[in-house]
Regions:
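Conserved AdoMet/S-adenosylmethionine-binding subsite of the radical SAM
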Residues: 146-324
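Auxiliary Fe-S-binding modules of radical SAM enzymes
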Residues: 1-90, 149, 246-256, 261-346
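Short beta-strand motif preference
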Residues: 84, 95, 106-108, 216
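Short acidic/polar mixed-charge low-complexity motifs
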Residues: 89-93, 102-104
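Canonical Radical SAM [4Fe-4S] cluster-binding loop centered on the CxxxCxxC motif
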Residues: 99-139, 143, 150
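Short linear Ser/Thr-Pro motifs
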Residues: 74-77, 109-110, 195, 217
Length: 346
């Protein structure tokens, strides 16, 4: 479900949109630098923009609106992660700023709630509210990047917050185009990653229409495992999903494919599972992220032990698979993978 909104949003304007409305390439460049440049967020449409004539800017004011979003709550983790509860029309979402030594990552949401029912994800317990608009997605980045440490600017965006991006693909594709356009925000295509639980038609369209990176939440070495954890994935078998990545690898060799594998104790964490994953990924050259399960109140699932995760990692690396073990970030404020559900931490 997508709201019918008129006029469309200011922070969903591509360079093509700006040139069309402002009737000038140079004015469009100036406006883009200002709209997407580093400044405090405001939901009020500016009356003027430096370097753009009032008459030209009035055409933008007459045809666009500013996303009505505001930060309702901020929570800070001991590891530097910051979670934002962002209020908007029809509900609220969560956005996370994750700092590292050299750059920060902004984790954005694509829906209020989620259309999927993954057993290990807190967002699934919220049900589905609505799809976000492209300007609301981009606004999350513009707001959260201002919280990044000066020595670690926000250079990465991951669509791994609330929602299934492939179920809101029209708006996600616009947001990815805006985030990667020059002169601003000017993120690299490899630095924008869209995650999916495995919606094959959406994946196919995303790979055809975007240069962004794709992350597939695999989370099982067999279809039976995967369906038990993610019931709505039964429509598209693992083999079909990975065949698509294999085909895309042959036509777009520079694109990065990520395989996300959340590890659960006694469910998907054996050496046999690891060997099956190696076989499944043959010919894809994907980067595998092993993710310890972050606990949520509504699920009895437990994370695999550190030793089991290490053993799984060794099997994959020994077979030549590029693989990393991801450390939980923001777990103490319910900001880690699978924990986003408006949980108050204070």
């Amino acid at each position: 479900m997508l709201r019918s909104v008129s006029p469309p949003g200011l922070t969903a304007m591509t360079m093509r949109d700006l040139e069309e409305v402002l009737e000038s390439r140079s004015r469009a460049l100036t406006a883009a630098k200002w709209i997407y440049g580093p400044r405090a967020w405001s939901s009020v449409m500016p009356s003027t923009v430096p370097g753009v004539s009032p008459q030209a800017w009035e055409r933008v004011r007459a045809t666009r609106r500013v996303a009505d979003v505001r930060v309702a709550e901020t929570a800070s983790s001991a590891d530097g992660t910051i979670k934002l509860l962002i209020a908007l029309d029809g509900g609220a979402i969560e956005t996370v700023m994750i700092p590292s030594s050299a750059r920060s990552t902004i984790c954005v949401s694509s829906q209020i709630g989620c259309t999927r029912t993954c057993k290990f994800c807190a967002t699934a317990t919220l049900g589905f509210g609505r799809n976000l608009l492209a300007d609301e997605i981009v606004a999350q980045y513009l707001i959260a990047r201002m919280l990044a440490p000066e020595q670690a600017p926000a250079k990465n965006v991951v669509f791994m917050g609330m929602g299934e991006p492939m179920d809101n693909l029209d708006e996600v594709l616009i947001a990815v185009e805006v985030l990667t356009q020059s002169p601003a925000p000017q993120l690299g295509h490899a630095q924008v990653t869209v995650s999916t639980s495995g919606v094959l038609p959406g994946m196919r369209r995303f790979l055809a229409e975007s240069r962004g990176s794709l992350a597939l939440s695999l989370n099982g070495s067999t279809d039976a495992q995967r369906t038990a954890l993610m019931p709505q994935t039964k429509t598209w078998p693992i083999g079909d999903l990975l065949d698509l990545l294999r085909t895309d690898r042959s036509t777009h060799p520079k694109r990065i494919h990520f395989i996300e594998y959340v590890m659960f104790d006694g469910v998907n964490d054996t050496d046999d599972d690891a060997r099956r994953v190696v076989d499944l990924l043959a010919g894809i050259n994907a980067r595998v992220n092993l993710i310890p399960h972050n606990p949520i109140a509504t699920s009895p699932l437990r994370s695999a032990t550190g030793d089991r995760i290490d053993g799984f990692h060794q099997v994959l690396v020994g077979a030549g698979v590029r693989c990393m073990i991801r450390s939980p970030r923001g777990q103490d404020i319910a900001a880690a993978c699978g924990q986003l559900a408006h949980v108050r931490t204070r």
